[in-house]
Design a protein with these regions (language model features):
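Short, small-residue-biased leader/transition segments that mark boundaries at the very start
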Residues: 2-7
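Beta-strand-rich domains and repeat architectures in extracellular enzymes and scaffolds
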Residues: 13-36, 74-79
Length: 179
């Protein structure tokens, strides 16, 4: 959604014609996860989301953000959860952090970088445990419960398999994780 002038002069958002895997809300913007991209609307447009730039000549802090996950693996993004450092998003084999080093998140300052390469069960959303995030990995014979801590804009987070002591406790076909 956007004005006729903006739509005509703007590139189409990357989600057009593609499946949207998840809809989130992050920093006063509607966030869409589609393919390997995280697409954020213009801020404050939740009622009528606007994914088109204001001007093709300049970049504004209020422009939408459309950023792709750079990876050596196929990395379709299926889910995300807000943490202090930014928006942590999950593909089936990698996790990425959408963040900024600046105080304002805008198209010029947004970064989407890989923070870990742990398998993730795309059918069950990650959950917040306060200062950590837990999520399931069902890539083996049984599911594994992982906990991610100390996720920051720099460096790698600590990822611990907290179900390691009971490796056969969680069946592969779990369909719910809650805190």
């Amino acid at each position: 959604v956007g004005s006729e002038m903006c739509i005509r002069d703007s590139p189409m958002p990357t989600f057009v014609g593609k499946r949207i895997n998840k809809v989130l809300f992050f920093r006063n913007r509607l966030a869409l996860l589609s393919g390997e991209n995280v697409i954020l609307s213009r801020p404050g447009t939740l009622g009528t989301p606007d994914f088109f730039i204001e001007s093709a000549l300049t970049v504004s802090a209020s422009d939408p953000i459309d950023i792709s996950a750079a990876s050596m693996f196929p990395s379709d993004i299926f889910d995300g959860i807000e943490i202090n450092a930014g928006l942590l998003v999950f593909s089936t084999n990698q996790q990425f952090l959408l963040s900024t080093d600046d105080t304002v998140l805008n198209p010029d300052t947004a970064k989407l970088r890989s923070v870990s390469t742990v398998n993730y069960n795309k059918d069950i959303p990650p959950i917040s445990l306060g200062t950590t995030i837990s999520y399931l990995d069902n890539s083996g014979k049984f599911s594994r419960l992982n906990e991610m801590a100390n996720t920051s804009r720099e460096g790698e987070p600590d990822v611990v398999e907290i179900s390691k002591l009971v490796p056969t406790l969680l069946p592969k076909n779990l369909d719910l994780l809650t805190n």
